[in-house]
Amino acid sequence: MVENAALTEMPSDELLEQCIDRYLEEHWEDIVADIDKLVRIPSFEDLGEAAEGAPYGPGPRKALDIALSMASDMGFEAHDDAGHVGYADLAGASEEQLGIIGHIDVVPAGPGWHFEPYQVTRKDGYLLGRGVIDDKGPSVVALHAMNLWHRMQLDGQAPQLPYTLRFIFGVNEETRMDDVHYYRAHHADPAFLFTPDAEFPVCYGEKGIYHSLMTSADVPVEQRSVLSFEGGTAVNAVPGHAQAVVRAGECEFPAAQGIEVELLDEHDAAAALEAAGAQADAVGRRLARITATGRSAHASLPQGGVSAIGMLIGYLLENGLVGEGERAYFQTVARIAAATDGSTVDLACSDADFGELTIVAGRAAMQGGSFTQTIDVRYPTTITGDEVHAKLEALAKAAGGTCEKTRDDAPFLLDPQGPAIQALLASYNQATGEDAKPFTMGGGTYAREFSRAASFGPEKPWEQAPEWVGGMHGPDEGVGEQLLKEAFRIYALTIGKLMQLDL
């Protein structure tokens, strides 16, 4: 507890608003340049290239170096925890902390981009590039909001803050969040923390998150019609792309929306058979490469996506391109991909706080002679992760395969009427003139990993963006510059309001 934190003489709202306006006017181009520095780093996890000081691969390591350099240049005390995580402090009157955590790792770019994914493109008031909204752009904006308070102190417009303000740079959010597990094993939790990695106005709870890997029986290549099958880029995204190489037989390949078929010439067919481990001379060579193009979407909001894996499997099944040894497995995956609410696999349920369960078949691959499929389920309080797993495990076994649970995080809720949530909400409403209410979501952010935390903006999904602006985890990821400017204002106001609470 910080004594007299509520009595600390803070700047008036009028002065703070003036300082915010001036900072945006003088430093907006600096903010965009800092976002671009991070977007230029393809900072997705690559464990095959992990090394000492770079436990998640070279991309996250390089992004962390850049972020810590930014913080150091602003005058903060920057620290690197062996590449697992980094943090920067604005020292307060107490060692007790208020925290902000953003992540600077990303999912891979994937196909389908019309803009360069690893640099910021500015077009008609929007920034485009991998990470501009998830979560490099918001992280840079929040770091600059922290810098605003530092500059106000240097200019004699703000006192030393009652809490130490800590910005934590995460680099493993998109996969296992091992970065925050490492951080919490070595540091105490802040008294309260928010993460700019969700939507406004403020999220006070997150659904449970279940991940698993479904694996088919090992079918000898000579008995398979499907020689290869792959799709998606991440477990936590509706797959926007999928591709298979199949024995074509006498199939005439009827036209279908989103499906492209390429008959392989003799050379490519022989190469495909060799890659699959088949004897080219012993098997007919009429092969086809079939590609499905759907629409990617984050697994927390899958309703707007179209599963390319589901499209591709449906086409294969409808046209007799699946062998008997593979049929049960592909039929099972097709059921999972057929509906995002779990109704096709008897998992549909909901509750008052979280709404309905969602399910996504995210990434498909080959493992030896087996097919594999990741599954992402976001579940409310009316079902448990164990119950979800039991249902999916039974489906896998019935198809002759297995289902291995790889993650299960229970739902979490904060009191929406508590002082911290209300402070965040008040900052949002002050900046926007709205009378918004807190909400819950299916997304999984760092907030669930800490003892007292909330996810807080900056997305506003009810605002329409041009059709060429994509969402997080999809191609042409984009964000409006005005939205980020508004987020800067909200975060700057929030720091002031939280500092006046007895947490």
Residues of each region from the PLM?
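N-terminal helical capping/dimerization or prosegment-like subdomains
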Residues: 2-99, 106-109, 374, 483-486
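Zn-dependent metallopeptidase/amidohydrolase metal-coordination segment
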Residues: 23, 42, 367, 427-428, ...
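A short beta-alpha structural unit
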Residues: 52, 331-338, 360-365, 376-381, ...
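Active-site metal-coordination/substrate-binding segment of hydrolases
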Residues: 96-169, 175, 470-482
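Acidic/histidine-rich catalytic neighborhood of metal-dependent amide-processing enzymes
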Residues: 135-219, 341-353, 503
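Short glycine/serine- and small hydrophobic-enriched flexible loop segments
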Residues: 144-151, 313-320, 493-496
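Acidic-enriched catalytic cores of C-N bond-cleaving enzymes acting on peptides and small amides
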Residues: 204-230, 235-295, 299-362, 383-400
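Short, hydrophobic beta-strand segments
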Residues: 244, 288-294, 371-377, 405-407
